[in-house]
Amino acid sequence: MPHWLTLMIESLPSLLWAGLLFTVPLTILSFAFGLALGFGAALTRLFAPGPFATAVRFYVWIFRGTPLLVQLFLIFYGLPSVGIVLDAFPAALIGFSLNVGAYTSEIIRAVLASVPKGQWEAAYSVGMTWVEAMGRIILPQAARVAVPPLSNTFIALVKDTSLAAAITVPELFRAGQRIVATTYEPLILYVEVALIYLVLSSVLSSLQVRVEKRLSRYGGYLEAAA
């Protein structure tokens, strides 16, 4: 068996374990918190009084306009200067969540704003409250449009979690770095790490296509019923 293949096989369990233990939870939790934050920020931009909307615009401006790596460094290495000390994983989780929240807020705001105002008026005309109109009329239509860009954000986040290695989170890429430090085989190991990320991204992309097809059929049923 070739040396490179032997090394890849021997390293695979450690890499997969790091991915399962850190990369996957970090991705899922960051996206969940970021999506909730983004939804709240989008609603604030669209419906809250001016000062609150301005505060959200400032937050989005900061986190979309600065590099994610810099944000992670500020949280993990910078905050201790003012007495706020975080472990690596919570620091990464906060950084990724805030970053995802900024991007998803713009996606959600755009898709909510794209729903015709007549849908709101129709909902109010049959006695629905704002919450009922949002939950039963607006969100189902907006979700169909939001899934592709939100899915792309999630897939990008899977790859972005490799930046957590810079603040010592022992995720997939960091595990690869440690193996490189003992084997002195950077090309083989980093190719293997890249292939794992590629497989993850490909699986998620395939799932995205299936979800989009189902939503497209659902949208067709709605249009036919209308």
Language-model-derived ranges and their functions:
Residues M1-A226:
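Transmembrane alpha-helices and adjacent helix-loop boundaries
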